[in-house]
Amino acid sequence: VVMALAGGARIFALLDEKPEVNEGDITLVHAKYAADDTVTETNESTGMWAWKHIGADGKPQYTELKGDIVFKDVDFGYDEKKIVLHDINLYGRPGQKIAFVGSTGAGKTTITNLINRFYDIQKGQILYDGHDIKSIEKDALRSSLGIVLQDTHLFTGTVMENIRYGRLTATDEECMAAAKLANADTFIKHLPDGYNTMLTGDGTNLSQGQRQLLAIAR
């Protein structure tokens, strides 16, 4: 009974949450290179994405999604009276691997939460491929990023279905390609039914490392 009451309290607290305000007007679209080497929009799934925004002339403009992240003089605190991050300047190049090392509460996870706009900064600017993240639609911003937490969660279903949760419209071939990029394809092929192997109980029939690889592929 006590657990049910606690669960009910969490559900009602979630229902009482105010919807997020989507302030941005920059969207994410499928893209390709035109004959003149400019980036253009397409309805095809090309594996290439671009930011779409309306220029001063009223025409759509496109910037290829590359993953360039810049923090400029960023201040942030969960409480305005207690700043956790102060005057942070950071440049993450596309394809670069960056490790944040520090004690618990130093703000390592906070930085990733700011990039996703789970929280907004008090001062400064965060740029994503040259665009202020506040000008990007939150759905577009978050769909362009992948977060794999230390504690991963899998669902009852096949390996293929668990990978596809990352993008429900993905084909089997795209899911397999994602698994190869995440270095998960090798162990998946050694499972009893490969990509059709059923996972139950949060993927308890897999090792922690294998669950992490599936989460990365997702």
Predicted regions and their residues:
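ABC-type nucleotide-binding domain
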Residues: 16, 31-218
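Solvent-exposed, non-transmembrane helices and loops of integral membrane proteins
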Residues: 21-32
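Cytosolic ends of transmembrane helices, especially the final helix of ABC transmembrane type-1 domains
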Residues: 1-16
